[in-house]
Amino acid sequence: MKENLTNLFEKVIKLPTTSGCYKMLNENKKILYIGKAKNLRSRVKSYFLEKNSHKIKILMKNVKSIEVITTNSEYEALLLECNLIKTHKPDYNVKLKDGKGYPMVRITHEKYPRIFKTRKIINDKSEYFGPFTNVKKLDQVLDFINKTFKIRKCKKKSNAPCLYYHMGQCLGVCYKENLEKEYQKELDKAKSILNGNISEISSQIDIKLKHAIQKEDFETAIKLKEIRNSLIEINQIQIVTKTNNLNIDYVHVHPGENVNTIIVLKYRNGKLVERDANFDESICKENELILQFLIQYYTSINMIVPDKIHIFLKDIDTKNVEKLINEIKNTKTEIIYKETEEILKIMEMAISNAELSLREYENKSTKALESLKIVLEMDKLPKIIEGFDIAHLKGQETVASMVTFKMGMPFKENYRLYKLNSLLKGEIDDFKAIKEVISRRYSEIINNNLELPNLILIDGGKGQLNAALSILKGLKIENKVKVCSLAKKQETIFLTTNKKGINLPQGHPALRILQNVRDEAHRKANGFNKKRREKITLLYTKIHGIGEKTAQKILKSIGTYKDILPLSENEISEKIKVNVQLAKRIKEFAIKENSIKNNNQDK
């Protein structure tokens, strides 16, 4: 590794000092990370420092080459970086996972507005109230408001009264005419409550509560008391700030050991309406992370850009990011940083929200793992899961992937890709492929005295499970690690202790974890196989007279250059339906490639 980094560094110190973008690639030419820089040489050199974080060191362990694209300005570099990340989606760049924000109340912009709970803001002149942290109490209040003020529930106009009208919970606006004034009067009362004016309605509830107690109608009394308490609570938690009625987002980055949390507190007309939590596993530093986040978040199709975006990081040049957002979204937003007593309070709230969101995120994973532990009859929590998948195209370029999940989340630093050698050309044998990859992975662990995972997941059914188990038995570790398989069609979980298999309902937290691991392993294996095939196809297009279609035909019908070597020119011609002259060039190319490879091995 040190030798590789030394060779890389020698190339890096020769990079231009202009602005531009850099791509970090692994040995298979897969892009791991994309960044931009004002000074390419200076920025890329910083990745070789000893004081870098663990994540950056893991990245650099896998980097085998660095490519750069120079630009005329820093803004052009930013624009290029944005496009490259969207195109390639590198593993080590920012990939946001949305957290579930607290719900709000939406009053629609219609002739007869409806009132309901939502987690999305739509720019259609609707009014929003909230957010509300206690969903149960919010549901109680909304139910009370809708019934008391007879708010419309139906989405479409009808020729007949709805069920709610017959129950006395609707004015009948779905079929009656000219009720605008009467409806608006009731709607204003509902809005008043949502704005925190609850003294009048609380007094009315208290009177009803006393009557219910006098009549010994304790069931009604309990319900009325719950509604009154819910009204008081939900109107205490709405936090208002003096923002001169502007729409402002406050963005806070909360770095974590494995997961970074980015909180967006959204204020509309001076009132906090939403807390949006996002989670990121990239290697980006705090300054770089917030800039990448702002671009991805605010340039997405459905995102409404506010008047101002306030960040809590000082001395960051956001002019280019601001310009890019405004150009893409046709807005006039400002990205600002200020220090006032009021903003410091908002910052404290953002930090506590970030910590809360991270705990919720981690707790969700822990509960799912507890569920998985019970389903698989494990003694310990499956904190570390390693998942395997095989990929090939009609027996060509068979490869395997191994992914690692720690506490239910991808741990990309530990991913592995394998070129399999035990299968013959055109041979399709998942069992043999699984045996090879399991043998290679766990021989490596035993030989290097590394930690075993708690759970091994194989993509497949009983046969694939037994193939893996036979290798684990040979290595004498079958009792040290739990192993299971997940069959695709029925999503059946197979265990060595359960021959019939386990079928969990869709959405079950234990099944969801296994599906996530399986799907990630599948994605990595297929991606690796595709890259291998593309590399070979590209190689064949260097032969004079060979286009992409013929190159693909060579790959499918014959295979790699090694598979071409034993064939005669006539055999090549017959297999891929080309003339003998072209077949001769293909044969010569294969001999030349083989000679180059042999010479490289001798050095």
Swiss-Prot record:
Please state every residue range assigned to the domain named GIY-YIG.
17-94
Q: Which domain of life is it from?
A: Bacteria
**GO CC terms on record?**
cytoplasm; excinuclease repair complex
What name does UniProt use for this protein? Answer: UvrABC system protein C
The answer to whether the entry has keyword Chloroplast is no
Q: Which HAMAP family match?
A: UvrC (MF_00203)
| GO BP of this protein | nucleotide-excision repair; SOS response
> What function is annotated for this protein?
The UvrABC repair system catalyzes the recognition and processing of DNA lesions. UvrC both incises the 5' and 3' sides of the lesion. The N-terminal half is responsible for the 3' incision and the C-terminal half is responsible for the 5' incision.
Q: How does it assemble?
A: Interacts with UvrB in an incision complex.
State the SMART domains in the record: GIYc
Source taxonomy lineage?
A: Bacteria, Pseudomonadati, Spirochaetota, Spirochaetia, Spirochaetales
